[in-house]
Amino acid sequence: MCSLFRAKDMGIDLGTANTLIFVKGSGIVLNEPSVIAGNDKGKTLAVGSAAKAMLGKAPVNISVVRPLQDGVISDFDRTADMLKAFLETALAVKKIRNFRVVVGVPSGVTEVEKRAVEEIVRQMGATEVFILEEPMAAAIGAGMPV
């Protein structure tokens, strides 16, 4: 059986509670709550733990949201901004360019949203992108014959 990952390969679990980024040879390099804070002009102010700390405490002009809810992307623009910020962090830490990536997405994501997620990851430097719904990723991870 061939390995799913090779050098400079990444896995992203874009989850409703947390987002994780795995880099082959380094393990999990990012594990953050799937939360983003932004102002009323659309500027991202915080993501992950920093944004989660603002939940219920932010002033009126700052929205703090979980852009993925109940297995679907409820706010695509915020999801895109959050994913970009997380990728920028992971790529800067590991100094990775020209990578392949598997992105696990909630099962309720539409084909249009899958293509948009793929495009975001490509813009960040991915040479190949594979979108995999989370139930399938879980089955593969459990060693089930799929």
Residues covered by each model-derived region:
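Nucleotide/phosphate-binding catalytic cleft detector across ATP-hydrolyzing
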Residues: 1-146
